[in-house]
Amino acid sequence: MADESGYDAGSDAGSDASLPSSEISFVEVKKPCEVCGSNANDHAIMTCFLCRDTREHIYCARVHLRSVPRMWICEECRMNPVVVNNVAPVDQEAAASSSRITYQVADSEVVNQTMTSSDSGNQISATHQQPPQAHASPVAVPMDTSSSDNQQPPSDSESAI
C-alpha cells in the first residue's frame, strides 16, 4: 500500500532504485513572491541579483516588466547606496566624522559629486563629463541678433580708426 509520498513499502518492483531508510533526500523549496505570496508562475519570478533573497513576479513588481531581466536588483538593495554604486566613500576620514557620505554615481554619463562641509554651511558641486566624441566641436554661444551692433566683428580697418 502506498502512503502520501507515493512510496509503496510492500512493493519489490524498483527496490534497487529506492533509497535506503537512512538516507534523506532534500527537495529545494523556492521562496514565494514577496508581494503576492504565491509560488505560481515560477518562470515569471525575478530573484535579486545582489541579495539573492528577494523574489517578485514581473507583474507584482512596482515597475511591471514584460520578461525576467538578467540582473534585477530589489528595492531594499537599490536603497543601499554602497551596494548599488559599489564604491567606497570618497574621503574615509570625512565619512567617519560626518553624517553625510559622498558616493560616486555612474549613469548614462559620468557624474562626479563632491560634497564638502564648511563652517558656513554645506556646499555641493557636481562635474558632468560627457564621453569623448569622435568629432568634438567647440561650444557655440548664441548671439543676440536683435541689435545691429553685434552682427559682425569689426574688421581690421575699422578697429584701427
UniProtKB/Swiss-Prot annotation:
Keyword check for RNA-binding: no
Extent of Polar residues compositional bias: 114-132
GO terms of molecular function: zinc ion binding
Residue positions binding Zn(2+) 1: C33, C36, H57, C60
Keywords: Metal-binding, Transcription, Transcription regulation, Zinc, Zinc-finger
Disruption phenotype: No obvious developmental defects. Plants missing all PHD finger-containing proteins (e.g. PHD1, PAIPP2/PHD2, AIPP2/PHD3, PHD4, PHD5 and PHD6) exhibit an increased expression of flowering genes leading to an early flowering phenotype under long-day conditions as well as growth retardation.
Binding site for Zn(2+) 2: C48, C51, C74, C77
Oligomeric form and interacting partners: Interacts directly with AIPP3/BDT1.
Purpose: Together with AIPP3/BDT1, cooperates to form a BAH-PHD bivalent histone reader complex able to read histone H3 lysine 27 trimethylation (H3K27me3) histone marks in order to regulate transcription, especially to prevent early flowering; promotes AIPP3/BDT1 binding to H3K27me3.
This protein's name: PHD finger-containing protein 4
